């Protein structure tokens, strides 16, 4: 890890529990954009995503229209994938519905079995990520496959994957 953004993310954010709805939404969007790309690629563009996505304001993202999609597609500082951009808007609406249903997104996540922070290394999925992914897809979220959800659970601090020897383990 030589990229200072990646080191800072590893040391101060990833695998550290944070259950604020705006943060949970931001991480869900960023993890979805990471599909097929490296984490470093997304981290390098994170601040630009924040600007382009109105600081990941859920209400604003829910109201994005074709003009905003065109604006995002022209933004050279973010990942310009039309399917992912449209999915992010769709997912914002579903995220908001889940928050309305469960009071907050963390409460929704807690409804899945074996809740709590777990320590796992060298995995890319588990039963929890499989179940959450299936449920989100039933709700019509996109780019939320089990591997993405597993990475998301790592990002928000539910799965701690620091390896032996890491000072954060």
Q: What spans do the regions from the language model cover?
A:
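HhH-family (HhH-GPD) DNA N-glycosylase catalytic core used in base-excision repair
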Residues: 1-169
């Amino acid at each position: 890890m030589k990229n200072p953004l990646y080191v800072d993310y590893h040391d101060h954010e990833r695998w550290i529990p944070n259950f604020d709805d705006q943060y949970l939404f931001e991480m869900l969007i960023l993890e979805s954009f990471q599909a097929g790309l490296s984490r470093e690629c997304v981290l390098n563009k994170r601040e630009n995503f924040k600007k382009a996505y109105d600081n990941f304001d859920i209400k604003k993202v829910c109201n994005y229209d074709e003009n905003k999609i065109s604006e995002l597609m022209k933004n050279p500082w973010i990942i310009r994938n039309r399917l992912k951009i449209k999915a992010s808007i769709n997912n914002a609406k579903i995220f908001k519905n889940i928050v309305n249903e469960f009071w907050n997104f963390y409460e929704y996540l807690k409804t899945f079995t074996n809740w709590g922070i777990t320590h796992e290394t060298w995995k890319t999925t588990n039963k929890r990520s499989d179940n959450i992914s299936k449920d989100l897809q039933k709700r019509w979220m996109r780019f939320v496959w089990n591997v993405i959800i597993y990475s998301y659970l790592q990002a928000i601090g539910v799965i701690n994957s620091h390896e032996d020897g890491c000072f954060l383990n």
